[in-house]
């Protein structure tokens, strides 16, 4: 792994409580300092309206289960086996609904007051030196593949971080870049960007630039004529910076990797050429930053994100320093937002409703989940230290007289142990005069074998052994007793790029679901953390919802097959329209979709966005989650291994935004990946079932059959055809990347033929 310090802090990293002065002045007691944050719960009436709506859906699910149990032979001629399968699936759906009601029961949001970071008695023109007690921040950026994550993407991320507004930023902000792909191009691009940063950072602060990623700032919509001061000095500076950025882009794009290695530009990479490309744990950057700058706060960022709010760190400090008890903010997570996001979220991966409804509800329990990027961590929480660690615990758990326990936990580096001791016990770090003096130490602690025999990867740092180490790390921090906070700012603190197209989206969801499944069946299960640690019960339930996403796949797949099965075999799994029980599933269908629709309306989203997300939930469940479930099942049997798959990033940071003529970025695209086979097969099967059922009705062959399917089964098949319409279009009309490849069609057709044959025998 190559770790590059893009900028380094040279001042003290003293941790603070973030307040004003203390004591009295002239015998008079000082008033309390103004609050840095405000907890704002949802209004009582609105909160109870949402609770009752969620409970209504849950009660209808329970009523449907009761109907199944009372009519266990399937009602008017229904098959008991089919009803039992439906009962099991609906019981699972009821359990998920109950978990969702619990998670969303007490929604809370926090409003930050960065202007109150100025201590009492100071004017708004307070100088940077007067912010001396604000802690330093180490900013950790991760990239993995120079092809899918071009170097210019990483460069823009780093430049936006270096230009953040923060008092004494040159001393208190440090940026570390980890390239798991070991690319000389990425290292060369960062070296080139260092010179540009020397002019870019002062330019941003001098003119109050809002968006500090150059590729966004210099877009056509951000020209000097459309915003900013129009004086001659600004125009000259703007033109100069634009020319310099264009030169930087050309130098990076025109660099050849082989030429770098041949002429000595890649001398640092010879030992890394055979390193496996994978999602390397963020622990390496944690250790390197610890022996160099050792800031008490760490910001973790993916390489495809950039700073969208230059005061993001100040907002985070309001939440990290604004509580009476440090346990209230072990980490601060910013919601994921995306630039140039497609209208109405056609691929269901922007997750706005998830953050605004689900995560806001979890904030009322133990706090937001760690999302893997855009998160401010207390270093001591990442080190596995419980909140409010006191002197008595120091003697018992780590040992203050000798470094034996520190060596066991953190390894044999004296410098790393000293830095860990300072963080754990809230001591001031010694000012570092020369960063270069720690280069050899940094190389030592970043070695691949350094963590052998230590607690790194389990009790210390980011957790090893999972494709979703972010969720696992956040859960471990919560299990120690820490809480977390969701930082919602206007404008959003950070912006990233969302995958576009079917292959990229489904690959990303499959990777997440695989990691979530592995956590569920491991010793890191949140249920065990609740039983033996300090993870709260309702927080455990919230984790189970997210970790249980891939476990929904077999139940949703079985339920989706019931409609076609019943039509093809002349059976029913739902009450007939003439029966009293028909009103229960009908009311459930209407109430669930209405409740879900109103959630999207409350989040300020459109009806089309609701439909796109509902449709994608069905597609993701049958495709990405199903394959993830099978992958983990095979791994648990020792028949396969999970592999980390890097998701391609938006190339607009690195290309000239030249889109293919006539391309529709919101339309589903396909390739020959196995993830498309299950959905294609289910779409074909439902079309076949509707066609067969319609023919039976038209020709009267279903008359007189007591257990013939009713309108409920036809509605289920028709609804799934609507949900899978992108695949139907890809099967029938799609061409090129918009059409499903013949290899996928043939495999899906084989599955459909096997299912139809099975139905004929039953």
Swiss-Prot record:
It is a multi-pass membrane protein. SUPFAM superfamilies: Nucleotide-diphospho-sugar transferases. Keywords: Cell wall biogenesis/degradation, Glycosyltransferase, Golgi apparatus, Membrane, Transferase, Transmembrane, Transmembrane helix. GO terms for biological process: cell wall organization; cellulose biosynthetic process; plant-type primary cell wall biogenesis. The chain crosses the membrane at residues 47-67, 81-101, 541-561, 582-602, 619-639, 673-693, 708-728, 739-759. GO terms for molecular function: cellulose synthase (UDP-forming) activity; cellulose synthase activity. InterPro entries: Cellulose_synth, Nucleotide-diphossugar_trans. GO terms for cellular component: Golgi membrane; plasma membrane. It is found in: Golgi apparatus membrane. The active site is at residues 180, 470. Residues 1-15 have a biased composition (Low complexity). The keyword Aminoacyl-tRNA synthetase does not apply. Its EC number is 2.4.1.-. Its main location: Golgi. Coiled coil: none annotated. Pfam families: Cellulose_synt. Residues 1-39 are annotated as: Disordered. The keyword Glycoprotein does not apply. Thought to be a Golgi-localized beta-glycan synthase that polymerize the backbones of noncellulosic polysaccharides (hemicelluloses) of plant cell wall. Belongs to the glycosyltransferase 2 family. Plant cellulose synthase-like H subfamily. PANTHER family: X-BOX TRANSCRIPTION FACTOR-RELATED. This is Cellulose synthase-like protein H2. It comes from Oryza sativa subsp. japonica (Rice).
